[in-house]
From Swiss-Prot:
This is Pyridoxine/pyridoxamine 5'-phosphate oxidase. GO terms for biological process: pyridoxine biosynthetic process. Pathway: Cofactor metabolism; pyridoxal 5'-phosphate salvage; pyridoxal 5'-phosphate from pyridoxamine 5'-phosphate: step 1/1; Cofactor metabolism; pyridoxal 5'-phosphate salvage; pyridoxal 5'-phosphate from pyridoxine 5'-phosphate: step 1/1. PROSITE patterns: PYRIDOX_OXIDASE. InterPro entries: Pyridox_Oxase, Pyridox_Oxase_CS, Pyridox_Oxase_N, Pyridoxamine_oxidase_dimer_C, Split_barrel_FMN-bd. GO terms for molecular function: FMN binding; pyridoxamine phosphate oxidase activity. Belongs to the pyridoxamine 5'-phosphate oxidase family. It comes from Psychrobacter sp. (strain PRwf-1).
């Protein structure tokens, strides 16, 4: 397939330095709220890129569950491909992309596990079948003989953990936080002269610097 003649002019907004707060998380929350108001489906979804010791990058979609004062939090299986990558190399990058708003946000930083109490509290907020489903993936991305075999594992786990009882949080499952050292806000503009404003800092203890980047 050839898409070389396809074009879309980006003319829905602009991004100026003078409107930016001193730290990026207020701006990220503002853009998330605007995406929610415009009914963007799952605006808290990110593409998460990791790279383990094999130097082979991997990317997948995960859901952000919290924006903190340091970065963004998501939950997953620690034994998954992404969990193994993070164990070997804690540097990662996340991308929010809101196509209808012609906006994206890149979040780069260092990933660490959230404390266990935070994981436990979030797990108990999940729907019952999502809690049970977390137990099925041992490990996530592991091979299974068939869909029927997976459904049977799920049914057996529902008997083991009846609805109404507390489903224990798997030890192999929990939260990660990307502590950001760079956050770039991108707003599409006409003629491909996009607005790119980058917040950066050497560590989470430093103040943010704001730089405009060429498109």
């Amino acid at each position: 397939m050839d898409f070389s003649d396809k074009r879309l002019s980006y003319e829905k907004g602009a991004l100026h330095e003078e409107i930016l707060p001193q730290e990026p998380f207020a701006m990220l929350k503002q853009w998330l709220n605007e995406a929610i108001e415009q009914n963007v489906p799952e605006p808290y979804a990110i593409s998460l890129a990791t790279c383990g010791s094999d130097n082979m990058p991997a990317v997948r979609t995960v859901l952000v569950r919290e924006v903190t004062e340091l970065g963004v939090v998501f939950y997953t299986n620690y034994l998954s491909h992404k969990g193994q990558d993070i164990e070997q190399n804690p540097h990662a990058e996340a991308l929010f992309f809101w196509h209808d708003m012609q906006r994206q946000v890149r979040v780069r930083g260092v990933i660490a596990k959230v404390d266990r109490a935070k994981t436990e509290a979030y797990f108990q907020k999940r729907p019952y079948e999502s809690q049970v489903g977390a137990w099925v993936s041992q490990p996530q991305s592991g091979e299974v003989a068939s869909r029927e075999a997976m459904d049977e594992i799920f049914a057996n786990l529902k008997q083991k953990f009846p609805e109404g009882d507390t489903v224990p949080t798997p030890e192999f499952w929990g939260g990660y936080e990307i502590a950001a050292t760079e956050i770039e806000f991108w707003q599409g503009r006409a003629n491909r002269l996009h607005d790119r404003l980058l917040y950066s800092r050497a560590s989470t203890q430093d103040t943010w610097q704001i730089t405009r980047l060429l498109p």
